Amino acid sequence: MEESAGATSAQSAATSVSESPAEETILVCASEPVTVDGGRLLVCRSPGPEGFYKVPLGLKVALPTGYAMLVAQRGGGRTTNGIVDAGFRGEVQAIVAPGRPRAQFYCTPLRLAPGIATDVPFFEVFAPKRDEDAGYDIPCPRELVLPPGGAETVTLPVHRTDGRHWAYVFGRSSLNLRGIVVFPTPWESGPCRFRIQNRGAHPVTLESGQRVAQLVLTREPLGWITGRSPFPATPRAPMQHRPAWLFARDFVAPSSARGARGFGSTGL
């Protein structure tokens, strides 16, 4: 699915091209015309406490279980990568850092993987999730005190022992809005580690055990995520698994445990 920050006044359905004969349906409801490979200026006049902005994309998505939606940017803006759960029924929003008035957003479905092998029991380190959730919450392994502009590398007491599928660490929307940004990072082998930065103007203390990030397991690689940038930009086609879109009217999204709470990820 390629979309900038646009959408359609009618509801639309997407059928993904899967490895199996069965088709999966993605429901999309949005309020303005779709703009493919284009962009429009979104203005938000309600910044968060550290100046980060919530930018509503005029888009609602209902994904099947086993999928998530990735919200990213094209170009050199300052949009945090966002993960939207299959169970989210609210309006999708992007979190944008101050200092750049224009951004082009890119939304695409991700196929989630069932699991990976680790040297210690997986749930000794990562929190369990519901079937409709995208990622496993990551509790902070120790207290972190981040001064303005300060960053720390977080290393979890777990090693990956297989090469099946792909694993990525993403931030949480609620912390992003406070200026606490996780560098999206692949976990390829060895220990799980990632950087977290305070881009706000005030010191922040993250308590031991506080949820600071999420681990997302995917069936396709996201090669543009390297762990070196807090705001990585996606190329034109981030997925090998490409959805084929069919447009229709009057689809009703199934109910979910998550509903419209939060930003669409495990961020709230």
Swiss-Prot record:
Q: Name one GO molecular function term.
A: metal ion binding
First and last residue of the signal peptide: none
Tell me which Gene3D superfamilies the record gives.
2.70.40.10
Presence of the UniProt keyword Metal-binding in the record: yes
Q: Which UniProt keywords apply?
A: Hydrolase, Magnesium, Metal-binding, Nucleotide metabolism
Q: What class of enzyme is it?
A: hydrolase
Single biological process term from Gene Ontology: dUTP metabolic process
| UniProt-listed InterPro entries | dUTPase-like, dUTPase-like_sf, dUTPase_trimeric, HSV_DUT
Residues that, per the record, bind substrate:
172-174, 263-264
Q: What is its EC number?
A: 3.6.1.23
Transmembrane segment boundaries: none
Q: Does the keyword Magnesium apply?
A: yes
Among the Pfam families in the record, one is dUTPase
Q: Which reaction does it catalyse?
A: dUTP + H2O = dUMP + diphosphate + H(+)
- Needed co-factor(s): Mg(2+)
CDD domains in the record, alphabetically?
Answer: trimeric_dUTPase (cd07557)
Q: Please state which protein family the record places this protein in.
A: Belongs to the dUTPase family.
Q: What does this protein do?
A: Involved in nucleotide metabolism: produces dUMP, the immediate precursor of thymidine nucleotides and decreases the intracellular concentration of dUTP to avoid uracil incorporation into viral DNA.
Name the UniProt record assigns to this protein? Deoxyuridine 5'-triphosphate nucleotidohydrolase
Q: Which gene encodes it?
A: DUT
